[in-house]
Amino acid sequence: MNILIVESLSKEYIGSLNKDLDDGNYKGYTPFLDSLISHSYTFAHSFSNGLKSIDAMPSVLASVPSIPNPFVLTIYSNNTIKGLASHLADKGYDCSFFHGAPNGSMGFDAIANTTGFQNYYGKKEYNNDADADVNWGIWDEPFLRYMAQTLNTKKEPFFASVFTLTSHHPFVIPKEYEGKFDKGTEQIHQCIGYTDMALRRFFETASKMPWYENTLFVITADHTNYQVAYEKSKTTLGRFAIPVIFYDPSGKLKGFEEQRTAQQIDIMPSVLGFLNYDKPFFAFGFNALKADSLNRNFAINYFNGLYQIYQNEYILRMNSDLSPEALFNYNKDPLLLNDLKFSLPDITGKMNDLGKAFIQVHNDRLNDNDMTTR
């Protein structure tokens, strides 16, 4: 089991997830991910639950969203939670987290420990500063290779997650790769090309290892990046639009979901469902891989004082008092200009009820330190 969290991987950067752009001619900056997506299960509409790197780990690895504030910065960060690593450790998995920054950076080692990882591999364990940039840590390509090689020393079953870093501001790549990737229109674009290449080489290395065929890979982003070129990516929806990709080398899990939404907090329950986990667990998210969940799944996040609820092709904005602010059909109205709140009162009311119920349960669980199974 492997989860790859890619720094600043906005959905806009992936050509195969943006076939509507440039009259269908948009290529994006991730040729490897485009090829992988054609053999994966992914979503037309998938979202982050936050806008910061520190929001991502609790969301992706423990199904705990950061609404309205980053969970790890709240008084509830000391609550008892049971992340994916904890659940898999109960089944005998060796669980390791990888991040190429200096150990302690952004508190990732502490969050990894809280969510159940037994082992942490950072810049210290990598132990070769010649492969580090001057800003964040070890370049993605050698660090992902290091992860694959380290995993090859593990006894199965194991679970690993990695948080990449090269595509973070100031958007620098190794000198030997300068000029090898499309510079596009934004400074980040060649960084995304570099990280995409690093992912390709990771999968090439992993594919030669005995554990590869038995491993489910999940690829997502920590959050979007402000460097986007298209107006739909600058909306309050676009600010959260990221990929959520499930890749099973055996080919048993393939498809492109165009209606059902997915979000970061859905990753843990989806993985546990796919692995036929047979113990009770608590998650704020849903199993996004379940075909019968079309009318139950929705996504949620928080931006500039408004909650945002996504279901099917609609996005509902809710005020801080949990009253509906505006409703949009983001398939037909990608720039979110035509408010449908009054013309579609039934949908507005249903989605508002979903949002209120979720927020009430979320707040009660946090206040009561009740974030595990009873």
Each PLM stretch: what is its role?
Residues 1-374:
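Solvent-exposed soluble domains appended to multi-pass membrane proteins
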